[in-house]
Amino acid sequence: MTVTFCGHGDFHGEKAVMDWLRETVGALILRGADEFLLGGYGGFDACAATVVWELKKKYPTIRSTLVLPYLDRTVDATKYAGTLYPPLEQVPMRYAISKRNDWMIREADVVVAYVTHDWGGAAKALAYAKRKKKEIINYEKF
């Protein structure tokens, strides 16, 4: 099972959300999740990567992949098993992150979300996941 994440960039690692994220990812692993696609941009992405990295110590067979929106940027991939660049060569740079997000959602079986308002990139990604009829686990419904 493949899992991806979407959430607000201004997330700062609030304890209640982090606890929920650990519990949610752990439960998904027990359900068979073994591949985690992560975006690497913003606060929620960083926290999701940290949680998956921590849980890899307990579940060594899980794999975390940093999905890159650009090829010309240097990134810190130390918390990931590897990186991947989806087929975005023809996408204008200003759309690369949203198109990368769409790609991750299409590839995933489950989307774990921290979306608390209905504007911005995280809200657009969540709306896309709903249109694609993905299983969505959202911290806070609005």
Model-based region annotation:
Residues 1-142:
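Acidic/glycine-enriched connector segments
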